[in-house]
């Protein structure tokens, strides 16, 4: 029997890769994506740099930023690649969420929501707006994927329940996020000095939200020990390293709860007297927790866009030649506006 030609070998390899991508669940794919969203100045960049072992000061994220990391699996084995996306501006740039979420990346995509624990009044609206916008975009991609590959879309919907045991008592009461979700509460060093009752409400609320969405929940700060634990969790998302099974639900310590290990019975009811809960008109359990939380921490009615600075004037993006040309063009524009204004006034006088 004649030996295979180089062309036949290459063709067989391509077909093999194609079939494995269609049949597998994405666990063996060497490229994964992690998308960081959350509170403005909440520490997202710091976490990413720590995970990538980059010793450099974090810079403010302007809009949507990208970087990547690589990990060696062994000798003569291709490196795993992790794509890290970060959305800046808190909730002011929701339109950019759709950019990294595509049908090509969704099967190996994860979301990390970083919430600033030191600003409890901003916590719920930040969390709600970002998760709703992200879920909306993911649902659109899954729906689009279903029209081309119904099997892949079906596998994604089934995978949503992978973190929840089949016999978990809360299984019928939850609504898992479409893709892996990790919620990180940052600035625990400030949060730990809060009044105990406030800490209790925040901890219980975040535990409920994380459990409802089938997400992991953990707190972090500048502490090296906590950053190492967070790094382990992110590495699991980015490179498929073994998932941690540790758990800490003590509100007097940094929470660390892996997805699927909490329960509604352990979390308990919303922290409000029964007679007060009865007065709240809620459409769903999530709505009830929201009303209870905002009773203690009413959201501040602020314009989320007012803090977004003009990047053209940001010194970290300075380019002398470009800036000089910009000044010149701005002056020319102002001169044109003045001359145009005079021309129109002259026309009005003549008429």
From Swiss-Prot:
Disulfide bonds: none annotated. Light intermediate chain of the cytoplasmic dynein complex 2, a multisubunit complex composed at least of eleven different proteins. The cytoplasmic dynein 2 complex consists of two catalytic heavy chains (HCs) and a number of non-catalytic subunits presented by intermediate chains (ICs), light intermediate chains (LICs) and light chains (LCs). One of its GO terms (biological process) is intraciliary transport involved in cilium assembly. Acts as one of several non-catalytic accessory components of the cytoplasmic dynein 2 complex (dynein-2 complex), a motor protein complex that drives the movement of cargos along microtubules within cilia and flagella in concert with the intraflagellar transport (IFT) system, facilitating the assembly of these organelles. Involved in the regulation of ciliary length. This is Cytoplasmic dynein 2 light intermediate chain 1. Residues 323-337 have a biased composition (Basic and acidic residues). Belongs to the dynein light intermediate chain family. Residues 304-351 are annotated as: Disordered.
């Amino acid at each position: 029997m004649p030996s295979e030609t180089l062309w036949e070998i290459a063709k067989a390899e391509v077909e093999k890769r194609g079939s494995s991508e269609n049949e597998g669940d994405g666990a063996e794919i060497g490229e994964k994506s992690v998308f960081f969203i959350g509170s403005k100045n909440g520490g997202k960049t710091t976490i990413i740099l720590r995970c990538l072992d980059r010793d450099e000061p974090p810079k403010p994220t302007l809009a949507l930023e990208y970087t990547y990391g690589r990990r060696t699996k062994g000798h003569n084995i291709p490196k795993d690649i992790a794509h890290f996306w970060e959305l800046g501006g808190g909730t002011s740039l929701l339109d950019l969420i759709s950019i990294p979420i595509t049908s090509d990346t969704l099967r190996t995509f994860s979301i990390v929501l970083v919430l600033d624990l030191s600003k409890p009044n901003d916590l719920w609206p930040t969390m709600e707006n970002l998760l709703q916008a992200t879920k909306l975009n993911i649902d659109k991609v899954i729906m689009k994927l279903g029209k081309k590959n119904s099997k892949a879309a079906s596998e994604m919907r089934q995978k949503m329940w992978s973190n929840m045991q089949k016999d978990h008592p809360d299984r019928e009461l939850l609504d898992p996020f479409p893709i892996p979700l990790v919620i990180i509460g940052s600035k625990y060093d400030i949060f730990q000095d809060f009044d105990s009752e406030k800490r209790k409400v925040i901890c219980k609320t975040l535990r409920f939200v994380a459990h409802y969405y089938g997400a992991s929940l953990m707190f972090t700060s500048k502490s090296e020990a906590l950053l190492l634990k967070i790094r382990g969790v992110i590495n699991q998302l980015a490179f498929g390293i073994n998932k941690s099974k540790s758990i800490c639900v003590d509100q007097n310590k940094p929470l660390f709860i892996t997805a699927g290990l909490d329960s509604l019975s352990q979390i308990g009811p919303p922290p409000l007297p029964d007679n007060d809960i009865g007065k709240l008109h809620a459409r769903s359990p999530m709505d009830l927790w929201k009303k209870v939380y905002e009773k203690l921490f009413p959201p501040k009615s602020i314009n989320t866009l007012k803090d977004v600075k003009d990047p053209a004037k940001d010194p970290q993006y300075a380019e002398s030649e470009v800036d000089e040309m910009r000044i010149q063009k701005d002056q020319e524009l102002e001169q044109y506006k003045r001359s145009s204004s005079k021309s129109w006034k002259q026309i009005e006088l003549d008429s």
